[in-house]
Amino acid sequence: MANTEAWTVHLRGCLFSFHKELIVLLMQLNQWITRAMGLLLLTSLVTSVYGQNTGSLTGRIVEEGNGAPVIGVTVTLQKHNRILVTDEVGRFSTANLGSGAETLLISGAGYAGKEIKIEIPIGGVLDLGDLPIQPTQLQDYQAYVGVVNDLEINESGDTQAVSTSVIVSNDVYLKNSGYQFSQFRHRTRGYDSRYEQRYINGISFNEQVRGVFNYSSIGALNDLTRNGNRINYLGASDFSFGDIGGSENINMRPSTYRRGGKVTLSGANRNYYLRGMASYNSGLLDNGWAFTSLLGGRYAYEGVVEGTFYKNISYALGAEKQWDNGTHSVSFITFGSPVERAQQGSSVQQAVDLVGCSTYNPNWGWQNGKKRNARVVKSWDPTAILSYVFAPNKETTWTTGLGVHYNRYGRSGLNWYNGADPRPDYYRYLPNYFEGQPFMQKYYTYLWQTGQISQIDWDRLYNTNHINNISGDGSAIYMVEERRSDLFESALNSTYTTRLNDHVKLSAGMGYKYSLSRQFKTVDDLLGANYLLDVDKFAERDFPGDQTTIQNDLNRPGRRVYEGDVFGYDYRYYLHSLDAWVQQEHNYHYIDLYYGSRIALNTLQRNGLMRNGRYPDSSFGKGDVHTFVTFDAKAGITYKINGRHLITANASVQSRPPLAYHLYVSPDITDNVVPSIKSSKNANIDLNYIFSTPKVNGRIGLFYTTFWDDMDKAAYYNDVQRTFVFHTLYDLEKVHRGIEVGINWAPTSALNFDFIGTAAQYYYNNNPMGVMNSTNGNVVNQEERALMKDLYIGGVPQVLGTIGINYFINYWFLSLNVNGFGMNHIDPAPIRRLASNYSQVLSQEAIDRLPEGPGRADAQKKHDAYKLMTTQERFASGCTMDLSIGKIIYLPGRQQINFNASVQNLLNKRDIRTGGYEQGRINLLYPENFGNKHFYMQGINFFINASYLF
């Protein structure tokens, strides 16, 4: 690392190191923001009228029939060439307008366009009241949030594999791709979910440990998460600096909800079969109070994937008080969505072929006549938010909020000690393992096809432990553990927005977040054993007779643990972040532009509660505090050819601290970190043509994003070292580039067509360094370059498209989509790209020079295995078809019944691979034993939703 001057500061016993130049910059920026915000607030309090000879305009866009506010609709003033967007209550407003005739162009994705002729007065305010627009689609994308995301969380639960917006975007491409492409595990521009920011009532809810928003925290709360703002990509925002994947602010303030109640009942054949919600909102009462409440849940005794189940209940309560004509508002809301669900596992192709089912799930087996799943997730994320909004005039808003939540997250899994592998698809139990033994191959094929060994044999596990209780020492050979990743997090955010003059708007904000993450595992079920010995099974094998190295906790050697006890590992993460950002927007007749910057201070520390025998000096107690100062900048410009045609360009440079999981090489057992500690960086640029005519509207965009100094981590069993290893890549470079097209053509008021697609490349752009560390202590900081350059980012299609036909008549809605996809690749394992694993492999030219015989055959087999194991698998392209139908029935007294049903994969294609990963085990003589593991698209599936509003 460079020898730059640093400051050392002692704060309550903790040691922090800061780069001097960056700290000075942070202090100067904070002082400037504080002074500017104070001055601007004072100015806004005493000046709220900008001119005597100009007029102002305000109005509210509502849905025809029920009067519900429509968020994110574009309102264009054609003569003034000014573009407005409706806020979370459907309202738009602007000032300093020249008097005379004007034409309003109203457009929103999923709504019929509308033109309104108005006359702007000289001075005063023209209030247009409620302006109804007609929906052209009833496909309730927001209702699908829980359906999409719960299936797409990977096996470890560390990352969410798709991008799904809670707030529907007004952008034609984003509105359709978020749901329509979710079945293919689409991610916005291929970005990880941590590049999308989620806020609730102005509070940041991207957790600091994983960097993502926890969608399960709002499961079955769909009716309370519809309102809010969405910023497409890294555009101008008044609640956040934003991120390259976009940002959302879910508005849960009770006063923003439609007065009345709603009862919703949904059915599906996916991860759950039944969902119900009942909510009631008081609206804003005459005394300034507003209240909201919701109770919901989701359930499946067995989901569409065999051996899975789903149990969930959700709740929300909120209250708000406004006074002084809405100048002041204080709101409080609390919600939660505890869930217990069984997971599906991936498997190799041979196992899938043997059972004849693409959704084969190796995670379950029979026990006492009932199906039992070994991998069960239990999660609960109770949340409370207190928010204060001060709006002294129409041009100024100051929002401050405090959010607190605690996430209890655990996932169970089988563990074993001195016993045969209990997983049914373990490579030794597959016919391929018995190469050259035709009888054994036929025998194991028969066992698989008759279902005798295709699932977990729970009875055998219990019997093995029972025998050891009688004739052995009574310790568990097989058991179920629960791996816990609990999180307590508190966040404080304050944002300020004001209009400085006719053309300039200023937004600024500050935020602080504290996170305490508890990482440990407990004994969930001893499966009939008396106890479990808390030692490392790999270390005991590799260090026989060494009673020190094998201990998981030297402070309590030879410890026996029982159900509910913590064992194996136990440590904490302490994370602090402080950030400040400022942004300015300029609006002129032909040009709009914005620019902004953000600076952040982040600290991370690990505290080990066990002294591990493999790392006795670096596992126990508090480790070093790692400090990162990051800086972001963004800018964008819009050229308004006229009110219907725009050209936009956006650019940004960002940096962010590494995730805790990436920074520590083996966090379960040591405080050691990667050799090169850097903040990851990215630079982004995009160019868009946006158009909105009476018949056609949409966007065509180009984007290019490059990442460098990034990190990634994989964990797998290493056959060479015969132990479990963590493999961390650092100094990683990636490129995401492509084109996006979203076009809606409405030849008539009843018929419109969607043309949505993206063609992109997401790939690794260098050969990063990697460092491996084993859990048994045999491998310590083993470094080698991984040959990843030009491999594709796995698990996300790089070419996607859909053509949709939407028909609307008398509040009946019918949609048909034909989807195409391609260029989807397996997630590559870095260990397969280490040259040291293939030191015995000869080139084809060298093999051709060898004499015929066993030696040449063996060399050819190794060479073929090398090519197989280093070639990235590309999944087959394909197409699917989706159908949806809906109906709105309006009743007297603003009552309403909604019905919508959708069917995905109407052609029932079950052979479509949507994702998967390469195994980390390498065997050059028998590579077929360690084939890739895949996920497949479910066959035909449906979602039915009915709701009654009163």
What are these language model-derived features?
Residues 479, 505-642, 769:
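Signature of Gram-negative outer-membrane beta-barrel scaffolds
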Residues 165, 172-174, 203-234, 251-253, ...:
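Short acidic/polar hinge/loop motifs at secondary-structure boundaries
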Residues 753, 820-861, 887-950:
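C-terminal beta-signal and adjacent terminal beta-strands/loops
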Residues 56, 267-300, 304-344, 376, ...:
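Transmembrane beta-barrel wall of Gram-negative outer-membrane proteins
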Residues 361-383, 387, 623-632, 655-708, ...:
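Outer-membrane beta-barrel signature, preferentially recognizing the C-terminal barrel domain
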Residues 340, 346-347, 550, 555-560, ...:
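Surface-exposed extracellular loop regions of Gram-negative outer-membrane beta-barrel proteins
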Residues 704-706, 727-832, 947-949:
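Gram-negative outer-membrane beta-barrel transporters
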Residues 320, 329-387, 410-481, 545-562, ...:
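Acidic/polar loop-and-plug regions of large Gram-negative outer-membrane beta-barrel proteins
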